[in-house]
């Protein structure tokens, strides 16, 4: 599976032209059937052409499904599920509440909010799953995954997500020096270091 990162070009405060700003990672999978819903939503949000159906609300990670039926249709099209509708989509979104990837904005219809820390962990997991190096520079790792560099994300979303990614990356780096003996339970490590001649097997026919 290929992954694409939305490396944003952030408009400056005094200009409408886009200039490359801090890294905002929004992993989205290309190909058939592998993309996750949170990745797909970030993909839609990263492209202004989708503003008619989904758009950011401010710079704190909040977004609104302007046309929830259209978002559901697009999701169904991507996943080859023609019967997809908003009811099914919203049930899938609720799954992310427990994962701390996003929450429902109370008092606002069709409004949701990404949790930057949870999203950072989800992005990091996606990188590692696809061969990224947790000990290397995160921005370099993400950049190597994708040629896409022209998506636009709100500057607040960019900076907050970048900060969360860096914080989570530091946590991973600090734990990566753990030795294999510490990671593998003692009993398991002892088993694999025991000469086979000393192991006794019972209850299994000799013909196997």
UniProtKB/Swiss-Prot annotation:
Keywords for this protein: Activator, DNA-binding, Nucleus, Transcription, Transcription regulation
InterPro entries the record matches: Ets_dom, ETS_fam, WH-like_DNA-bd_sf, WH_DNA-bd_sf
GO biological process: cell differentiation; regulation of transcription by RNA polymerase II
Tissue: Expressed in a subset of head neurons, including the BAG sensory neurons, the AWA amphid neurons and the ASG sensory neurons.
PROSITE patterns found in the cross-reference section: ETS_DOMAIN_1, ETS_DOMAIN_2, ETS_DOMAIN_3
GO molecular function: DNA-binding transcription factor activity, RNA polymerase II-specific; sequence-specific DNA binding
Keyword Ribosomal protein: no
Annotated knockout phenotype: Lack of CO(2) avoidance behavior. Down-regulation of genes required for BAG neuron differentiation and function. Reduction in exploratory behavior and an increase of animals in the quiescent state. Unable to sense downsteps of O(2). Increased intestinal fat storage.
Compositional bias of kind Polar residues: 10-19
Main location as per UniProt: nucleus
DNA-binding region of this protein: 35-115
SUPFAM superfamilies, A to Z: Winged helix' DNA-binding domain
Spans annotated as Disordered: 1-20
Cellular compartments annotated: Nucleus
Cellular component terms per the entry's GO annotation: nucleus
Pfam families on file: Ets
Function: Transcription factor that plays a role in the differentiation and function of the CO(2)- and O(2)-sensing BAG neurons. The BAG neurons are required for the behavioral avoidance of environmental CO(2) and the sensing of decreased O(2) levels. Promotes the expression of genes that play a role in CO(2)- and O(2)-sensing and in egg-laying in the BAG neurons. Positively regulates the transcription of the receptor-type guanylate cyclase gcy-9, which is a critical component of the CO(2) transduction pathway, in the BAG neurons.
Sequence similarity: Belongs to the ETS family.
PANTHER family for the chain: DNA-BINDING PROTEIN D-ETS-3, ETS
Name of the molecule in the record: ETS domain-containing transcription factor ets-5
Species of the source: Caenorhabditis elegans
């Amino acid at each position: 599976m290929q992954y694409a990162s939305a490396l944003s070009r952030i408009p400056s405060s005094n200009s409408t032209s886009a200039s490359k700003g801090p890294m905002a990672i929004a992993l989205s999978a290309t190909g058939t059937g592998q993309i996750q819903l949170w990745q797909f939503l970030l993909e839609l949000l990263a492209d202004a052409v989708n503003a008619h159906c989904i758009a950011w609300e401010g710079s704190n990670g909040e977004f609104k499904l302007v046309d929830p039926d259209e978002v559901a249709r697009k999701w169904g099209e991507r996943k080859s599920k023609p019967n997809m509708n908003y009811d099914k989509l919203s049930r899938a979104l609720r799954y992310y509440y427990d994962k701390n990837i996003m929450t429902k904005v109370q008092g606002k219809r069709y409004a949701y909010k990404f949790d930057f820390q949870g999203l950072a962990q989800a992005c990091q997991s996606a990188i590692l799953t696809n061969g990224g190096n947790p000990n290397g520079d995160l921005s370099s790792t993400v950049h190597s995954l994708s040629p896409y560099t022209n998506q636009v994300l709100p500057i607040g979303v960019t900076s907050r997500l970048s900060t969360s990614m860096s914080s989570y990356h530091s946590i991973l780096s600090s734990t990566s020096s753990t030795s294999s003996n510490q990671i593998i339970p003692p009993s398991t490590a002892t088993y694999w270091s025991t000469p086979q001649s000393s192991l006794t097997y019972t209850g299994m026919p000799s013909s196997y």
